[in-house]
């Protein structure tokens, strides 16, 4: 039965989430050392380049998009930055020790620990206002089982947490990897060209790089996905999906499968 009420999490989960919110960098280093090799990172780099090549072929074979818009699409595709496994900078043991040098925690004073953490986190946020944007910074911890595409910097990221079985393994056959993490990679690449991502250019600037007719054609072709989702009904709550709100994820899902296949 759907009630909308969230059950209280068990104490161990609360403690784990609380610790991870502060010590994500140290925990991430330990997780990577145990589960993710340099060879796996190189393998993933090859997969991403292969899927980008497939997406380029899809653009080339496209019959409804003008050459001017295709040219911009090629530039954006080529400029997509990839982040794999873990940060490439500020992730050594010395870097992490320096990062936490002011975090003097006590196992007997949880409240004081939280106050100190909030103080240091707020200070870090304030100081960052006077610093240039660090495009090497990650939006996820290395152990998270997730992936993302960022429109504002035109990048895709795959933490080490998702680069594990059953999504990915160097011991898998290529067909298994492309059928699992390959679809996820293609999904994130496609996000750069969905209803929202397509509004940003190769540098992550909000700019219309589409010819008007091409944009109209794109909207017409995504309508079938909108309609398909709008016809999906959940009888238990007497509601249907909002086809417009879900189109970005559905376009990315379809694109990911096509690229990976």
Spans of features found by a protein language model:
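Catalytic nucleotidyl-transfer cores of nucleotide-processing enzymes
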Residues: 1-6, 11
């Amino acid at each position: 039965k759907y009630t909308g009420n969230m059950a209280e999490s068990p104490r161990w989960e609360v403690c784990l989430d609380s610790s991870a919110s502060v010590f994500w960098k140290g925990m991430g280093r330990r997780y990577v050392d145990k589960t993710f090799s340099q060879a796996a990172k190189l393998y993933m780099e090859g997969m991403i380049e292969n899927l980008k090549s497939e997406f380029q072929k899809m653009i080339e074979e496209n019959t409804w998009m003008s050459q001017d818009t295709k040219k911009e699409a090629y530039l954006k595709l080529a400029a997509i930055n990839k982040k794999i496994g873990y940060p490439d900078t500020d992730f050594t043991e010395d870097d992490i020790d320096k990062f936490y040098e002011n975090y003097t925690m006590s196992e007997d004073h949880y409240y004081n620990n939280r106050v100190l953490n909030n103080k240091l986190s707020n200070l870090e946020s304030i100081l960052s206002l006077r610093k240039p944007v660090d495009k090497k910074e990650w939006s996820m911890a290395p152990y998270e089982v997730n992936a993302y595409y960022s429109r504002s910097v035109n990048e895709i990221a795959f933490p080490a947490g998702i680069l594990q079985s059953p999504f990915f393994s160097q011991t898998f056959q290529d067909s298994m990897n492309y059928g699992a993490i390959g679809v996820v990679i293609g999904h994130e690449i496609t996000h750069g060209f969905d209803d929202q991502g397509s509004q940003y250019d190769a540098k992550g600037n909000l700019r219309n790089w589409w010819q008007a007719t091409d944009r109209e054609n794109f909207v017409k072709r995504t309508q079938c996905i909108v309609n398909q989702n709008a016809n999906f009904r959940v009888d238990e709550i007497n509601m249907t999906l909002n086809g417009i709100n879900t189109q970005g994820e559905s376009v990315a899902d379809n694109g990911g499968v096509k690229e990976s296949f």
